């Protein structure tokens, strides 16, 4: 069973509420839309919306807010009389209390849209992250909070998994970038110890996700929104090669192929060109060494599903 599924499965985690299950899932996904949550949980929209509501309601409505809201409603119905000054003062007070309540609730769950007609995205706030780490017995750090500016990136990563599910392909496992990083650090720390590198040396490269289809097919996943500059892409490819060289000394056999997914054909070609350029330079810089080059392919969104289903056999740009 996939690690993200165990939090949703009532037999695996019988004591969790639906709100807690969704907190755990959002922690893995980073940012997700309602339609993605429907596919990945198997719940209907009503059940998900109720769970989202319950997460936000972990911050209860203050009694004074309820009281003032009731008074204002009675005033509008003519059941009680307030002077114009009293009414305006009450409305201002309610508006202020509502803003404070929303701010506190966003510490658990943030819902936002790029504009009024855009798709809504959901992500955990600091308290939601803290609660998720408690359930997982992980340390809490603020860097685990997902920046909302990366909504398109996280949505694109999640769509890779959603397309698989829609195609009837059930993964054996799916790790978000954070969890994949934790797995890699085990081997990277062994490498650091062997090379006597400083303890603070950071992992050279972290994939966006790790997909296991079965015991013979697993992949690192990279999703590209086309927002990264060529220089950033070059550093990413260079750091990827750097990590594969480092880990070949401790556990090279566990390093899987890499699947890149991007938004359009022209971007795909550019990614492949940059990757080839970096590889040529890397080999020149490591002349005489046995370079480990991970088999890597790139797809426009949608083609990746055909690849995972075994329907196409693309030419890799590396490996």
Describe every region a protein language model picked out.
Residues 1-145:
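Nuclease-adjacent, charged terminal/linker segments that flank catalytic cores
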